[in-house]
Each structure stands twice: as structure tokens, then as C-alpha cells.
Amino acid sequence: MRSQFKDDFSFEKRKTESQRIREKYPDRIPVICEKVDKSDIAAIDKKKYLVPSDLTVGQFVYVIRKRIKLSPEKAIFIFIDEILPPTAALMSTIYEEHKSEDGFLYITYSGENTFGTVFPF
């Protein structure tokens, strides 16, 4: 999936920013969170997050749900490299395994299970 953030900023600028963030906040993970293009779920007001490394994927999903004001009965799916991560996984583990070459972790979300693959842990 194409990232709007990657389209808006050059690789060098993204890499420099992620390095600056990691130096200033070594216990935080730089995350870019964007909606899947054709999803009918609400767009998020903020794409860039500094996530505590001990946060779980499930806790991060809760943050996203709050930001887009998603009602409890509605489903949300998040994807990393087009795969559904386990909700109990730590964001630090996901970051180490799936961070982009620019130093950011790219997460997409959707109201439906667009890709349908679960992490092979």
C-alpha cells in the first residue's frame, strides 16, 4: 500500500526525522498511521505518533479508535506490511521486525479485514 507520508516527504527527510526522534526519545517508537485508501472508516486527524515501546498493539488500536471516534460496535483492523499483528505483541517487537528503512513503522487501518493474513509467530 502506498503511504501518503512517503509521498509528501523525501526519504532523506524522513530518515533524518526518525533518527532525531529516536535520539531525543530512545524509549519511543516513531509510527506513521494512515487509513487504507478505499476503507469506509473515518480518516485520522494525526498520522505521526511517538508510541511508548512497552505499549501493546491492542493498546495502540485503542488509541486509534479514540482518535477517529469509532463506536464500540464498529470493527477496526490494523495492518503492518499488509499483515494483521497480534494484539498482545509489543510495539517495540513489531518495530524491530517491521520498521521501514527510513526508521518509521508504517501502520494502516481499515474498517474491514482488507488483506486477511495473520502474523506468522
UniProtKB/Swiss-Prot annotation:
Keywords: Autophagy, Cytoplasmic vesicle, Lipoprotein, Membrane, Protein transport, Transport, Ubl conjugation pathway, Vacuole
UniProt cross-references to InterPro entries, sorted A to Z: Atg8-like, Ubiquitin-like_domsf
Predominant location: membrane
Regions that span the bilayer: none
UniProt PTM comment: The C-terminal 5 residues are removed to expose Gly-116 at the C-terminus. The C-terminal Gly is then amidated with phosphatidylethanolamine by an activating system similar to that for ubiquitin.
SUPFAM superfamilies the record matches: Ubiquitin-like
Subcellular location: Cytoplasmic vesicle, Autophagosome membrane; Vacuole membrane
Membrane topology classification: Lipid-anchor; Peripheral membrane protein
Any GO molecular function: phosphatidylethanolamine binding
Biological process according to GO: autophagosome assembly; autophagosome maturation; cellular response to nitrogen starvation; macroautophagy; membrane fusion; mitophagy; protein transport; vacuole organization
Propeptide cleavage-removed residue intervals: 117-121
Residues with a covalently attached lipid (Phosphatidylethanolamine amidated glycine): G116
Impact upon substituting R67A: Impairs interaction with atg38 and leads to defective autophagy
Domain of life: Eukaryota
Site feature (Cleavage) residues: G116, T117
GO CC, one annotated term: phagophore assembly site
Family: Belongs to the ATG8 family.
Entry function: Ubiquitin-like modifier involved in autophagosome formation. With atg4, mediates the delivery of the autophagosomes to the vacuole via the microtubule cytoskeleton. Required for selective autophagic degradation of the nucleus (nucleophagy) as well as for mitophagy which contributes to regulate mitochondrial quantity and quality by eliminating the mitochondria to a basal level to fulfill cellular energy requirements and preventing excess ROS production. Participates also in membrane fusion events that take place in the early secretory pathway. Has a lipidation-independent vacuolar function to facilitate the degradation of vacuolar integral membrane proteins during early-stationary vacuole turnover (EVT) when cells enter stationary phase.
Complexes and interactors: Interacts with atg43 (via N-terminal atg8 interacting motif); the interaction is direct. Interacts with atg38 (via AIM motif); the interaction is direct and leads to recruitment of the autophagy-specific vps34 PI3-kinase complex I to the phagophore assembly site. Interacts with hfl1.
Protein name stated in the entry: Autophagy-related protein 8
Gene label: atg8
